Amino acid sequence: MIVTNYIPNAVKNLKLTSAFRGYNPGILDCIETSIDGRIIVVDDVEGTHISTNVEDLHRCCMCVNPNNNEIIVLPLDKRLIKERKGGMADGAVFDEQKFVFLEFKDHALGNSDTAIADTYTKASSQLSSALQLFIEKLATNSICVDFLSSVNVSCHIIVSDKFPRASALEQNMRLLFSMENNGVELSFEKEIMFNSRTGRYDK
């Protein structure tokens, strides 16, 4: 469901409509919301969005939402953000307490150590670019929101179940990413838990 006349609390708290005023389409024309207990999020030609197709499970990000909070799905690359030097993360999922940037590499094959490293390096760069954009936008004088203090921010690289995992490389990349990005966590987990209770129905 695309929301156009209601601003979710998670969006209001971060003043995202003001921070990205003038963007076309705007925040409210991009987002989807759901209070389902399990939310399948994918990225394809339509951008990052909610899917109801169980065939997408092998390549999706699964948001687990036991308290039925209002979860926001925001497509970024080529949707809200048309172009940015350094690239852009595919999208984000968030509620009032947690904000997660997503970069999908679900079509990557990872058929060599070099290919795996290249996939992860490009994805982490795109996530870092998105993170810095939000930090900068929300820190402007007219917004005055400390993004990293307002919500629990993390970044996730999503690969398909067939992609070969490299635990040592992933650990090194986690450490490097955290050092270069104000302590923000980089994760390779496809499942994201939203378990805080929020006043999702407040307007």
What is the meaning of each model-derived region?
Residues C155-K203:
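Short, low-complexity, polybasic intrinsically disordered segments
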Residues G91-V93, K98-L109:
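Conserved catalytic cores of phosphodiester-cleaving nucleases, focusing on short active-site segments
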Residues T114-I158:
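Catalytic cores of nucleic-acid endonucleases
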Residues D77-E83, M88-D90, T140-V145:
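Catalytic micro-motifs at enzyme active sites that drive phosphoryl/nucleotidyl and oxygen chemistry
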Residues M1-R84:
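Basic, amphipathic N-terminal segments that precede the first structured/catalytic domain
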Residues R84-V93, T119, A123:
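Catalytic centers of nucleases
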Residues R79-E83, H107-G110, K162-A166:
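Short acidic, S/G/P-rich loop/turn micro-motifs used as interaction or catalytic elements
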Residues C63-V64, F147-L148, F177-N181:
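Short, conserved catalytic or adaptor-binding loops enriched in Gly and charged residues
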